Amino acid sequence: MAGNAYSDEVLGTTNWLKEKSNQEVFSFVFKTEDVQLNGKDIGWNNYKKELQEDELKSLQRGAETTWDQSEDMEWESTVDEMTKKQVFIYDSLVKKCLFEVLSTKNIAPADVTWFVQHEWGKDQGWHCHVLIGGKDFSQAQGKWWRRQLNVYWSRWLVTACNVQLTPAERIKLREIAEDSEWVTLLTYKHKQTKKDYTKCVLFGNMIAYYFLTKKKISTSPPRDGGYFLSSDSGWKTNFLKEGERHLVSKLYTDDMRPETVETTVTTAQETKRGRIQTKKEVSIKTTLKELVHKRVTSPEDWMMMQPDSYIEMMAQPGGENLLKNTLEICTLTLARTKTAFDLILEKAETSKLTNFSLPDTRTCKIFAFHGWNYVKVCHAICCVLNRQGGKRNTVLFHGPASTGKSIIAQAIAQAVGNVGCYNAANVNFPFNDCTNKNLIWVEEAGNFGQQVNQFKAICSGQTIRIDQKGKGSKQIEPTPVIMTTNENITVVRIGCEERPEHTQPIRDRMLNIHLTHTLPGDFGLVDKNEWPMICAWLVKNGYQSTMASYCAKWGKVPDWSENWAEPKVPTPINSLGSARSPFTTPKSTPLSQNYAITPLASDLEDLALEPWSTPNTPVAGTAETQNTGEAGSKACQDGQLSPTWSEIEEDLRACFGAEPLKRDFSEPLNLD
């Protein structure tokens, strides 16, 4: 844009509006209405009484000057003098109202940005737009400003009314002006509360895009809509002619247009919301994201992991309900977006998988005590936790006491985190704690009795509605169940009567893990990191937590009578430089086999051993001899090197003893 192509007034106004482009201001409209009092008609042009105050006279002369300076000399205006005078009086009264409110707030006029424009509308007639704002203005003050301006506006209108009115009629006119809200404020209606709230506008944008684009009124009475005159706190638009105003609007629009148009994607939820979010809402949403990210599922976890946000919400009015509802949204989000298997797997430390030994875990040791294929059992459990078990949605650990049922179930529940517990003591609402959970834990289950149908629905992964204490019914989505018991839960008794028709349906819903081996007293608990590492090991080795993967690995889906011992797992050992694998063929030493090795004479000749020295090695069969033999074999295995002759001699002596060797070597060899 060439600097000499436009006048200084145009460029100055454009730059001034650009400086104020992001300033938020109130938007008011001053107006009048036709009133009839005792047969006396009062219209918009009946407020032309001579003003007595010096300040009002000065403001009126300023309006007259603005009109004269902003007229275009190329064409002659036909607006009559009475209409002009009425607009001048209105301009002085509007500014008088603004200055009086500023005075009550102790705000200096120099600290305020304002714009006034008198217009004529086809339907509304005369009205005056006012934009006002500053550093001492806030959105919450908008309605207070409207009430104060309405009071002053009605008072000064009564003073300027040139219709002969009695004192009672003047009071009535003022009441009508105040009650009818002859000063209005730009507001928006909240969709939820259905209340009106102040809507601030951007000062520069509103003037350039809306007010400066209008045409000037040139006829009397006005036939079309347009503006009479305008003024502002910076004395920028006061004396601009109509063409210059349109030019300022064009320059401002061109300068404020972004060079590159950024494409923004608005979600359906944002479009539906279509409102301004409060700081409280933003704070709650930020807190909720942090709670979900850190997997906070209980008030205790919140207190420990996010104490600042917990105290902040607790200190608010109704904080207890706010905490409860926020935590409920968090658990609902986890329950709908994650499975129990996902929550366990994300806790695994994958960097430790290299040295992780699956058979050394306490869970696999418990399964190995029963001769089971622990990889197969863990794979089946993970499929159920991943909601891939179909109708078989429950893992049942049952058997005598002290067989490891509860410690495995407890380790799985702790790894999941978002767990609901069945409360058998609460007869009427046993599932009160089981909504919005990733896992339901039933500890020491007994006779289901009257609740058997509800239990079967939950154990099969169906969506059902349950009653809650003090609340309405609530829906339980398909949720895996882990159950421990010492009893035969397939036998259902209602009163004194056994109901055998429930036995098979219950079995069809259970992954049956029957533990019978009593654990030693020093066995200990399952480590909290054990199940995350088990899940990560299964995924790494191709055991995906889906029923398709399970069938591909083990042949069929598990049933109630599943043989967990087949196929067998080879005895695992450590492979040098790698993790222990359950499918590595074990090496053996002579003592690990149940037979004796007798070397042939030709073999001894090939060995070319030196004559036997006095044997100091104990006779084979003693504990010391066995330990020595194992040590020699282990040294050979660990070294992975060719043995020396002395090591071979030492191993032979350790394995067979001195006397058996001499006797075998002295006997003649009979090849027949």
From Swiss-Prot:
Q: Which GO terms describe its cellular component?
A: host cell nucleus
Principal localization?
A: host cell
> Per the database record, which ranges form the PV NS1-Nuc domain?
21-259
This chain belongs to which protein, by name?
A: Initiator protein NS1
Please tell me where ATP binds in this chain: G399, P400, A401, S402, T403, G404, K405, S406
Q: Where is this region: DNA-binding?
A: 1-276
Respond yes or no to whether keyword Transferase is given for this record: no
Segments carrying the region annotation (Ori-binding) are 191-195
**Cofactor(s) needed for function:** Mg(2+)
Q: Which family does it belong to?
A: Belongs to the parvoviruses initiator protein NS1 family.
Catalytic activity, as annotated: ATP + H2O = ADP + phosphate + H(+)
What organism, scientifically named, is this protein from?
Murine minute virus (strain MVMi)
Query: What does UniProt say about this protein's domains?
Result: In the N-terminus, the endonuclease region is involved in binding to the origin of replication. In the middle, there are the ATPase and helicase activities. The C-terminus probably contains a transactivation domain.
